[in-house]
């Protein structure tokens, strides 16, 4: 049985408004195991489900298998669960076929499959990159290129709130994209805490999430904010900071404290053309 894994992704900058996104890898895992079979079946945490994206991936790669998914990343939470699943599945298939794990090819395929299957508005190249590579990334999702990457040794707090995701009006988010330009500029400079704060103020205002959850962290000088299109909130910093924030956030839902992923989830090859020139 072949297996591969990928990380959760916490958001610094939502890519929906401008096409530029930023995220970081979190040590919450999705593991995909492949068992050769005459029939495609997908089991997610023990429950059989149909997966259009899995069908597209396996058919395009000429593989038939039973797909067993073990994931601790909640779906529809803003933590890149779909990106992690697609990353792990593509890597597992490539391993099964004895192919090189070229990060650029895998992540471009991830974005393409995600768009075709309708599980992402932007292709989520930022989430996919953080999910595979770990650390912090800034990406141009439209050109499917990385702008910068940064390592970080520390921890993350992840809040899964009691409330669910609201409606995402992506057109409205893009129409007022100028309001988030400061966050884009900060992310490109590697000022992730500032970018996260500006992004959170915008996304919470536009999608109706409570800003007070992030403000509880900001009051303590902690870098935190809304993740993806919500409803989860994430933070990064020292272990002590994350444990203190977990106590504060506990009233809003379940909180996990995990390491920020500091190495790729799989033994991937990272080619130079992966990066976009800032003037490109």
From Swiss-Prot:
Pathway, per Swiss-Prot/TrEMBL? Metabolic intermediate biosynthesis; chorismate biosynthesis; chorismate from D-erythrose 4-phosphate and phosphoenolpyruvate: step 5/7
Q: Which Gene3D superfamilies match?
A: 3.30.230.10
Is Amino-acid biosynthesis tagged as a keyword? yes
| Subcellular location per the Swiss-Prot or TrEMBL entry | Cytoplasm
Listed under GO biological process in this entry are: amino acid biosynthetic process; aromatic amino acid family biosynthetic process; chorismate biosynthetic process
Q: Which domain of life is it from?
A: Archaea
Q: Where does ATP bind?
A: 74-84
Give the molecular function GO annotations.
Answer: ATP binding; shikimate kinase activity
Q: Which Pfam families match?
A: GHMP_kinases_N
Question: PANTHER family this protein is in?
Answer: HOMOSERINE/4-DIPHOSPHOCYTIDYL-2-C-METHYL-D-ERYTHRITOL KINASE, SHIKIMATE KINASE
Q: Which protein are we looking at?
A: Shikimate kinase
The species is Archaeoglobus fulgidus (strain ATCC 49558 / DSM 4304 / JCM 9628 / NBRC 100126 / VC-16)
- Gene for this chain: aroK
